[in-house]
Amino acid sequence: MRIIVKLFFIIFIFSSLTNADALITKKLENDAQKKYGDFAKNRFISIDEELIKGLKDASEIKKLNVVNRWVNYIKYSSDKKVYKKSDYWATLYEFVGKNKGDCEDYVIAKYYILKELGVSPKKMKFTYVIYRSRSGKKISHMVLSYLKVPNPKSKNDVLILGNNNRRVLPASKRKDLIKVIKMINGDTGPKSKKWKKLEANMKRKKL
């Protein structure tokens, strides 16, 4: 009997730790409701049920398309308006909770959801680009790049997940992205202070 009780206790502790490490937890959903209201809680439930659980067995391409479309429904707003800062990398939780953010926030949200879905971080790059708007204005921008093959030689082997275009397209089809400034390897390469701060905030599920 004691052995059974001990085994049950070990399983319970292990399960609790595993749930705490999940991208979306019940505690997070309830905390989001307290801070932002029912809409925010329902959005996190949607991530967990529709995306993480619903796409678990889907192809990688389908995961990219569905996650990209879901995240792009969030409203665009500058860091100055939302956080009173010129540049701020919001967590997935802040971005979804507030239901607004800028281009980096879309990239961060897509990255972490796709990572939770089993997409290798080595395939995903935070990519700084110059974007040409419909009016012809050149703007600094960030998109998430997905590498179909390691060290791609062709633009057709890089898929772009951006917030200015709701479709996932090969880089060769994104004529509005006129120059790549640099690519960041996410959590697989050298980490900047900004990245380390984001990781710490994600770990504590900062809302």
Residue ranges and their predicted role:
Residues 2-10:
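Sec-dependent signal peptide recognition
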Residues 11-19:
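Hydrophobic h-region of N-terminal signal peptides that target proteins for export
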Residues 18-207:
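A structural boundary/capping signal
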